[in-house]
Every structure is written in structure tokens, then in C-alpha cells.
């Protein structure tokens, strides 16, 4: 009796066994959700083992390589997180001097430049991470090897005199709680600045709340977001906006963006229902 061969899709992939492609994309942190994964697939941006994959239902195995092609010119996928925030929050960038904390390769910095910032201080604890194309922009002032937790107005201005005019702060930090960094940022730029920060629950909850690198408990994620909002409030920064990041973190963690502004914000209590809805969506 002849051996039954696995069914082959119209893309030429054997589809027996394995996990759905859209599910795998979300599980591997390559897409925010199965819905966004399906959009990436439909756009022709996804390949499996180097071959174009056009169906969300395609079955893939753990050992197969899934890649999402870059569909734009940004130096990092983090750029799309800040774009989502600036599209949702009425934060003016044009004509302002911005401080990008945790600049890394420069995705946030790149977005700020494209939106008309007159100067961006790209600060990071690491060295030589900023993409050459971003570093080459004359409006960028690179500050490397500086831990934002210990930043002061004087120390930053000594390294970057242009920072004296900073009135917009964006932050994308890893391996440290925002609650530990916000006090230094407020002291450095003052309360009149707008703050747009990326909240990563995996760095806000304790180790006990993380399973295989992920914060899967909705209550813990909600506590993480609320905790950052209250930390900002205690420093004199009201909450003016909260949203879910359009992209998951590199390990698949859900992330969130918050806007703090003394001119437009309010007590975090007024945001509790929205935070809960966003986290549990």
C-alpha cells in the first residue's frame, strides 16, 4: 500500500502537523497578535525557510525559520511603536528638542527627526549601537555609556549642551523599571516636558510573575501599567494617554505606551478602566 504523502499547499509547503503560521508569528514575538500576523502574511512580508508564505493557516514546525521582511526604511521595529503613540496622542514634535532615553539603534530618534524635531539627544547606556544613517543626521547628539537612572540636568548638559532646551522625552528601556528612571528624567528636563514612554511589564513585575520570559497574567500586566502611571503621578506627572503597542516585544511580551503631561493629564484613577480594557483586549 503506497505511503500517503503530506498535503502540499499552493506555495509548495508540506502542511502536515505543526502550528498555524499566524499563531506561530504571534508566539515568536514577530507579530502583536494573530490578526496583525494575518495582515503581515497578506502583505507578502512573511517567509518560511526563505520561501514566501501567503496563508495564515499554513502549518509550520518549531524548527522552521520564520522571517518578516522589513516593509519600510526604519532602523528598528521599535519605530512603529512610537509612531502609534504620536498618531494617537496630540503630542507636537516639530520644532522641539527631544531626549530619547534608551535610543539603541535609533528607531525612536528616527521618528522624531522625521516629525520635525530640531534636535534629538540620543542617550543609551551602551556604545556604538546607533545606526549610522541616524547618527549622521546633524540634528542628533549622541550620548553613550550613560545610565539614565543616574542622569541629572547638570551631567546631561555637560555632555550635550543642546539638552538644555529639551521639552520632549521618549523612552524605550529594558532590564530596568521605569519607576527607577522617571525620577531622574523629571529632575533632568522638568515637569513642563511631554513624556512618551514604552511600558514593558516584564521589567516592571518581579521574577515570580514571569514564565519562560513572558508575563501572561492579565492582572500582573495591568498592575505593571498602573504602577508606572502612579510612579509618574507621584513625581507630578499626570497621565494624558495610554494605549497598547501595535507590536509585541522581541520575546512576545505585550507592551504599552503612556503619555504624561502636566498640561493635558489627569489622575491615574481616571484611567483605570481604560488600562484594564487595553490589557485584557
What spans do the regions from the language model cover?
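A basic, amphipathic helix-loop patch mediating RNA/tRNA/ribosome contacts
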Residues: 7-64
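Conserved class I S-adenosyl-L-methionine
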Residues: 93-104, 112
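Residues at the N-terminus of the alpha-helix immediately C-terminal to the conserved SAM/SAH-binding loop
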Residues: 104-109, 126
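Conserved S-adenosyl-L-methionine
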Residues: 111-119
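S-adenosyl-L-methionine
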Residues: 121-180
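A short glycine-rich, Lys/Arg-flanked "PGG" loop and its adjoining helix->strand segment in the class I
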Residues: 179-196
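Short, glycine-/aromatic-enriched active-site segment of Class I SAM-dependent methyltransferases
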Residues: 201-217
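Flexible, glycine-/basic-rich loop-and-beta segments that form/coincide
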Residues: 254, 261-281
Amino acid at each position: 500500500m503506497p505511503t500517503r504523502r503530506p498535503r502540499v499547499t499552493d506555495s509548495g509547503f508540506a502542511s502536515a502537523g505543526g502550528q498555524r503560521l499566524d499563531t506561530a508569528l504571534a508566539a515568536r514575538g514577530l507579530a502583536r497578535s494573530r490578526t496583525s500576523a494575518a495582515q503581515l502574511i497578506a502583505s507578502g512580508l512573511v517567509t518560511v525557510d526563505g520561501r514566501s508564505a501567503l496563508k495564515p493557516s499554513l502549518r509550520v514546525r518549531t524548527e522552521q525559520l520564520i522571517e518578516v521582511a522589513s516593509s519600510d526604511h526604519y532602523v528598528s521595529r521599535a519605530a512603529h511603536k512610537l509612531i502609534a503613540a504620536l498618531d494617537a496622542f496630540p503630542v507636537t514634535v516639530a520644532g522641539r528638542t527631544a531626549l530619547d532615553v534608551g535610543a539603541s539603534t535609533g528607531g525612536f530618534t528616527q521618528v522624531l527627526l522625521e516629525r520635525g524635531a530640531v534636535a534629538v539627544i540620543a542617550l543609551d547606556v551602551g556604545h556604538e549601537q546607533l545606526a549610522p544613517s541616524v547618527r549622521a543626521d546633524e540634528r542628533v547628539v549622541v550620548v553613550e555609556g550613560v545610565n539614565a537612572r543616574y542622569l541629572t540636568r547638570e551631567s546631561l548638559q555637560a555632555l550635550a549642551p543642546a539638552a538644555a532646551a529639551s521639552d520632549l522625552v521618549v523612552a524605550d528601556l529594558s532590564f530596568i523599571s521605569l519607576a527607577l528612571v522617571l525620577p531622574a528624567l523629571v529632575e533632568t528636563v522638568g515637569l513642563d516636558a511631554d513624556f512618551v514612554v514604552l511600558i514593558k511589564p516584564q521589567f516592571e513585575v518581579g521574577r515570580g510573575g514571569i514564565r519562560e520570559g513572558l508575563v501572561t497574567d492579565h492582572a500582573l500586566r495591568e498592575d505593571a501599567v498602573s504602577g508606572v502611571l502612579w510612579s509618574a503621578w507621584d513625581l507630578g506627572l499626570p497621565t494624558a494617554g495610554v494605549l497598547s503597542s501595535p507590536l509585541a516585544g522581541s520575546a512576545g511580551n505585550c507592551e504599552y505606551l503612556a503619555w504624561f503631561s502636566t498640561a493635558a493629564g489627569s489622575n491615574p484613577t481616571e484611567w483605570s478602566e481604560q488600562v484594564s480594557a487595553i490589557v485584557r483586549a
